[in-house]
Every structure is written in structure tokens, then in C-alpha cells.
Curated annotation (Swiss-Prot):
It comes from the Bacteria. Its main location: membrane. Belongs to the ATPase epsilon chain family. It is a peripheral membrane protein. This is ATP synthase epsilon chain. GO terms for cellular component: plasma membrane; proton-transporting ATP synthase complex. GO terms for molecular function: ATP binding; proton-transporting ATP synthase activity, rotational mechanism. Produces ATP from ADP in the presence of a proton gradient across the membrane. It is found in: Cell inner membrane.
């Protein structure tokens, strides 16, 4: 099977750079599965898990809070607002963020506050979903 190069970067750091046999990303229109020689594409990504299968390694999970996905036949680049390796996600922190966001949604003072709270809630739920995926794999 062929491979392509993957770069996942956030404003803080490079999270992943290396070869992959396939990758699955949470694109705005739904999950996108990417194999070598994929048709070029540029799309936004939503909060969720990016799954990377590198040659001779177990599948790796990276949580992204949103950003952009660029696909070229031999390289995939994800520019994430925030990116965290799955193993580094903090469940207690994500649960607390979810609880805080739910309270903010209920107690909204303005439309802007409500939109921000909804975004925070969506991000916390996506983090918890990524943690659950890791647990199912036994990591």
C-alpha cells in the first residue's frame, strides 16, 4: 500500500509530521477518509478526532478543535485552531468545560454569549468523544 505525508499543526506546535497509509478527519460535511493519491481538496474541519494510520504502527488519534484541511495527492495538511494528541486529553478538564458551557448556554445574557457558549459546548463534547474512542481501543 502507498503512503502520503501528513502534517498536523496548531498555533502552539507541530503535533504530527510523518507518513500515513490513511487518515480520517472531521470535515464540515462529515468525516473524510483519505488514502494516497486522493483528489485535491480544501475544506474546513470541525471539532473532533483525526485518525492516522502510519505504516507498521497502531492508529493514532489527534483531537482538533477546528481549522482547515488541505489534501494534495501526496501530502495532507491540517492547520488546527488547537490540536492535542489523544493520549494527552484530560477527561476531567473536558467534563468541567462541558458543564461550564452548558451553564452558560442556559444563563445566556446576549446572543454573542450564547454563540460562544454553544461553540465551547461543541468543543467539549468533541473532546469527550475523542476520549471515548481512545478507551474503546484500550489506550
Amino acid at each position: 500500500m502507498g503512503v502520503f505525508h501528513v502534517d498536523i499543526v496548531s498555533a502552539e506546535e507541530s503535533i504530527y509530521s510523518g507518513p500515513a497509509e490513511f487518515l480520517v478527519a472531521p470535515a464540515e460535511g462529515g468525516e473524510v477518509g483519505i488514502y494516497p493519491q486522493h483528489t485535491p481538496m480544501l475544506t474546513r474541519i470541525k471539532p473532533g478526532s483525526v485518525r492516522i494510520k502510519a505504516p507498521l504502527k497502531e492508529e493514532e488519534l489527534v483531537y482538533v478543535s477546528g481549522g482547515m484541511l488541505e489534501i494534495q495527492p501526496d501530502i495532507v495538511t491540517i492547520l488546527a485552531d488547537t490540536a492535542v494528541r489523544g493520549a494527552d486529553l484530560d477527561e476531567a478538564k473536558a467534563i468541567e468545560a462541558k458543564k461550564h458551557a452548558e451553564e452558560a448556554v442556559r444563563d445566556r445574557a446576549s446572543t454573542l454569549d450564547y454563540a460562544r457558549a454553544q461553540a465551547e459546548l461543541s468543543e467539549a463534547i468533541a473532546q469527550l468523544a475523542a476520549i471515548q474512542k481512545l478507551r474503546k481501543r484500550g489506550h
